[in-house]
Swiss-Prot record:
It comes from Carassius auratus (Goldfish). Cu cation A2 binds at residues 196, 198, 200, 204. It is a multi-pass membrane protein. Component of the cytochrome c oxidase (complex IV, CIV), a multisubunit enzyme composed of 14 subunits. The complex is composed of a catalytic core of 3 subunits MT-CO1, MT-CO2 and MT-CO3, encoded in the mitochondrial DNA, and 11 supernumerary subunits COX4I, COX5A, COX5B, COX6A, COX6B, COX6C, COX7A, COX7B, COX7C, COX8 and NDUFA4, which are encoded in the nuclear genome. Binds a dinuclear copper A center per subunit. The lineage of its organism: Eukaryota, Metazoa, Chordata, Craniata, Vertebrata. One of its GO terms (cellular component) is mitochondrial inner membrane. It is found in: Mitochondrion inner membrane. This is Cytochrome c oxidase subunit 2. The keyword Kinase does not apply. Residues 1-14, 88-230 are mitochondrial intermembrane. The keyword Transmembrane helix applies.
Amino acid sequence: MAHPTQLGFQDAASPVMEELLHFHDHALMIVFLISTLVLYIIIAMVSTKLTNKYILDSQEIEIVWTILPAVILVLIALPSLRILYLMDEINDPHLTIKAMGHQWYWSYEYTDYENLGFDSYMVPTQDLAPGQFRLLETDHRMVVPMESPVRILVSAEDVLHSWAVPSLGVKMDAVPGRLNQTAFIASRPGVFYGQCSEICGANHSFMPIVVEAVPLEHFENWSSLMLEDA
């Protein structure tokens, strides 16, 4: 969950998000080292009037500043490609949920069950209970079992939307007439908040997403109650 004055990412709640955080730190360190080197060179050039005649036409320097950027790009590209393939990998999902974007709410359908689905609307500010978050709470949460692969099928009924939950490392575009898919594994129990991440009209800011990860037995009890009420 994000909080005021936060400078970093939200706490990771899935293996993919943990990998993304590690890659961010890895890339940021490379950027920091390059920036430090460039700043040192600029300060050295400005602070002295002396000129080294041996570097005016140095083949060694030409070789270094050609090879070094190539090595840096490889060091960034390899972990990036690894995470890219991890995000696209969907192996034997235990649960499949279809998320449909509407103006301006989400609807969810648990395709492994015969009649388990619901619409999820934002809770108005005046109806919030103590401790709930403004513009982030919904009347129905998307409940998933923790430590289980969950596949999300994402589409839209009207215009472009985007289903995104930062703590889970998930962001998938919802395109009318197209079915996109992604997957995640919630590594710990908790309530994780997200929002529509594609401008979709006047009430774009009022399309929150709430994912609640619970132990498997709690999920089975919840699904049984939902099926009884259907």
